[in-house]
């Protein structure tokens, strides 16, 4: 018998409904309870009466967006950005910055309070400027052959469409100044279909720019690009299908307060917020309470953002990173900064590392700054190192909670926590935590 395929019927979404918003979650979504179901509503504030368009509905929760504001909150503010309604970037600009921060901090502290009986010292928030804080940006490029128009900007939320922008209020002023000039440059490009994207970084020694193209540069375009880089003092890199070429200027770098200078390649990860990166490093150094006799381990160390400053206060510092090119850069940064008591090793921290030679050293203190996926596997091995203090920098509250539970299980106590508002006007929540081994 032939079984005919019958497509599954799409569940029909309920019609728009009206509700009063009761709360705000840490991602900037309004929260309403309707007949036992929790609804998370985009662009809604507490105490507002809103008409809600349903985006998705599950058994226990639903997701919607404001279709119409029937009664606005006195807290609602006019978004500063001209592209706010269409850009997929900063989605919390209608919320006053103090409320954004208070809501994130409250959510973080409430989650962590439930994990241990002992009191946790909740430290003042680490925050900075709410605008012009981003020193790095990736711009999408799209050539519309029909209108003969090149779009430079960001993708719309939940869409592949590009929002054509001339400025962005969260970018470093040096990057903002270049945006209209990039429009002007690329409008005369001979092969606009070959344009991929642009990455810009406001380094401490100037602006670095990477242009991604799908084929080798035409001579006309290469000349335009080199003239642009020379006239605007831009460190220029071009990436085609085969390689990245450094065409003009020095390697970018940034400097920390202790004098450490970290050189990096244009595509390397660096913290986007210059000011808060420094504040975060200062906090880590303070909480670790470093001594001249200490041996310190820095996991997920990148190019040495924490390792090099740590090394200036201790007997030895060891940095571990999974990506070999980053390890090589960290070593070069250590040499340039005359940090002779620091060593860097490549190791996959999602695999067992207890048999590695570097792991056989008795470490007094440990710092880890893992990716969003957290550090669960690494923590299983860390328990054997018996360090007295661990500082954990997190960029994901969900994996932080999971990893805190592991550390508590392994005999550590959560002593201090501070929220880091690294990305104002977004849903991102970062934090730094101090753990001490139970005696």
Curated annotation (Swiss-Prot):
Ranges of residues in domain TRAM: 10-68
Function: Catalyzes the formation of 5-methyl-uridine at position 1939 (m5U1939) in 23S rRNA.
Superkingdom classification of source: Bacteria
A biological process from GO: rRNA base methylation
Binding site for [4Fe-4S] cluster: 81, 87, 90, 168
Name of the protein in its database record: 23S rRNA (uracil(1939)-C(5))-methyltransferase RlmD
Reaction(s) catalysed by this chain's protein: uridine(1939) in 23S rRNA + S-adenosyl-L-methionine = 5-methyluridine(1939) in 23S rRNA + S-adenosyl-L-homocysteine + H(+)
Keywords: 4Fe-4S, Iron, Iron-sulfur, Metal-binding, Methyltransferase, rRNA processing, S-adenosyl-L-methionine, Transferase
Taxonomic placement: Bacteria, Pseudomonadati, Pseudomonadota, Gammaproteobacteria, Pasteurellales
Pfam families the record matches: TRAM, tRNA_U5-meth_tr
EC identifiers of the protein: 2.1.1.190
Protein family (similarity comment): Belongs to the class I-like SAM-binding methyltransferase superfamily. RNA M5U methyltransferase family. RlmD subfamily.
